[in-house]
């Protein structure tokens, strides 16, 4: 059965960010920037072209200008620092294990698809897998910080999972999964953090433990990207689109689930690879300056700008030094939303309190 992909909001919207300045085809969006003594300047940003992420750029693909004058590579010692020094990328896979799934003859295909997904995304991010049925609680299949052996054991347990409640607590599971993702990212020891939730389900909410609107509000209020994969005819596009605000795929049966997981996984990986942490040593020693970073790729160009104060700058710069990015909660929340949605952070809105009704069970 062929893969049927439906995007309520095209994936391009997710990765099309507003550039501070752009050339013919590249868009650069500044996520964070900072200076540090003795003369370090670091900028964390995303690169896109035609609403698609641009990966694998090298330090030599960027030109750095200060006050519109090119800074030589020998002088700047510009380098691409590992984004992991400043950012954390977490993905939570939420798998429907209600009776219609756990008691079906398609469980093997679903389990294999989940294992494939974790292997694919886990090379770039930390990945956790949680299951839900009709119960109030989520079930931790594999957490964000397990050993490799624990991960393998957890994923293998999907195939032998026994549903405690045959109903489907989809709404409650999504709200609680977002809470788990928030909690995990909150414990990360880096200033830049973003998460992704991927929901796999074969049906609509039947348990009615959490109202639909509460789930929708939680998804919309979350700074994280949320994808949905629906299998079968019970779940409709309307429900999938409200869960998968970043995009969704509906397939006819579980035999196509591997392709669906693969497509979502590829998008997540590419989305991660669009981020760059460019660091260099400024030749300035005093005064306020404008730095312009220009990316050049296959004839296309794009630019971003950042103003900084070089007061007290002096020799001795190491461009590989981790940048002192802001870690305050409010600033981080705006950055997370911008990174997850691909849009500039909106004006502050009243916070929607979506309480996680339930807890996580570690029993399989």
What is each PLM-predicted segment?
Residues 20-21:
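C-terminal motif of bacterial Sec signal peptides marking the signal peptidase cleavage site
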Residues 137-139, 146, 150-195, 206, ...:
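Von Willebrand factor
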């Amino acid at each position: 059965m062929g893969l049927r992909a439906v995007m309520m909001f095209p994936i391009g919207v997710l990765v099309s960010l507003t550039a501070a300045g752009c050339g013919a085809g590249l868009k650069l969006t500044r996520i964070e920037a900072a200076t540090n003594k003795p003369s370090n300047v670091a900028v964390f940003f995303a690169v896109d072209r035609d609403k698609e992420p641009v990966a694998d750029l090298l330090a030599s693909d960027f030109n750095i200008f200060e006050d519109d004058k090119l800074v030589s590579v020998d002088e700047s010692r510009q380098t691409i620092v590992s984004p992991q020094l400043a950012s954390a990328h977490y993905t939570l896979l939420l798998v429907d294990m209600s009776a219609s799934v756990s008691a079906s003859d398609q469980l093997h295909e679903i389990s294999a698809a989940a294992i494939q997904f974790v292997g694919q995304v886990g090379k770039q991010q930390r990945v956790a897998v949680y299951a839900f049925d009709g119960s109030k609680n989520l079930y931790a299949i594999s957490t964000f910080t397990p050993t490799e052996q624990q991960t393998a054991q957890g994923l293998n347990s999907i195939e032998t999972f026994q549903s405690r409640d045959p109903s489907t607590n989809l709404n409650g599971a999504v709200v609680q999964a977002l809470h788990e993702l928030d909690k995990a990212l909150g414990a990360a020891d880096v200033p830049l953090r973003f998460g992704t939730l991927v929901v796999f389900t074969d049906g609509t909410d039947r348990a009615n433990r959490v109202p639909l609107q509460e789930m929708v509000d939680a998804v919309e209020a979350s700074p994280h990207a949320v994808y949905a994969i629906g299998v079968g005819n019970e779940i409709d596009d309307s429900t999938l689109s409200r869960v998968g605000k970043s995009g969704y795929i509906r397939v006819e049966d579980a035999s196509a689930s591997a392709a669906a997981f693969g497509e979502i996984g590829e998008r997540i990986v590419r989305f991660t690879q669009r981020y760059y942490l460019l660091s260099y040593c400024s030749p300035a020693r005093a005064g306020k300056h404008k730095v312009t970073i220009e990316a050049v790729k296959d004839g296309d160009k794009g630019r971003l700008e950042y103003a900084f104060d070089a007061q007290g700058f002096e020799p001795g710069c190491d461009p590989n030094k981790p940048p002192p990015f802001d870690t305050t909660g409010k600033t981080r929340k705006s950055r997370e939303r911008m990174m997850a949605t691909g849009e500039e952070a909106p004006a502050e809105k009243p916070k929607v309190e979506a309480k996680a009704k339930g807890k996580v069970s570690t029993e399989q």
